[in-house]
Regions:
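Nucleotide-sugar donor-binding/catalytic module of glycosyltransferases
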Residues: 2-148
Length: 148
């Protein structure tokens, strides 16, 4: 019998992105994933029956890059979408993003390097929050997990 790890794509990162009516920002999010220096990933976009053009945009982007997999679903909410993404993910590692996130181009490379240095089952990273003002105010997250 094949083990779960043998059926997964060794080293690949599955990025799971639930979305509902995110056409205003999902393009920037996907573009930030496409710009990653680490290219061993798949993107599962779980569209919760969007009505604003999100579906069409994701389908177009999937035609342009074979690593993008649109999953069109009935509207069941973000938690159900994430769970479905976990079921369909083919990568050895899983990462969750929201449609309004933007990743630094080195994000996956740094994540992979850190996972390679440890035997960790979970990685948490800092993030910056932009409040939408033209001058861009960012707040760094700190102290989410304690190691002692």
């Amino acid at each position: 019998m094949e083990s779960c790890m043998e059926s997964k794509k060794q080293g690949q990162i599955s990025i799971i992105m639930p979305v509902y009516n995110g056409v205003s920002w999902i393009g920037e999010c996907i573009e930030s994933i496409l710009q990653q220096t680490d290219t061993n990933w798949e993107l599962l976009v779980l569209d919760d029956h969007s009505t604003d053009g999100t579906t069409e945009l994701v389908l177009k982007l999937a035609e342009e890059d074979s690593r993008i997999f649109p999953i069109l679903r009935q509207r069941n909410g973000v938690s159900a979408a994430r769970n479905e993404g976990l079921e369909k993910a083919q990568g050895e590692f899983v990462m969750f993003v929201d449609a309004d996130d933007k990743l630094d181009p080195q994000m996956l490379s740094v994540l992979r390097a850190m996972l390679g240095q440890t035997e960790s089952d979970l990685a948490v990273c800092d993030y910056y929050r932009w409040n939408g003002k033209p001058d861009g105010i960012y707040n760094r997250s700190e102290g989410l997990l304690k190691t002692d």
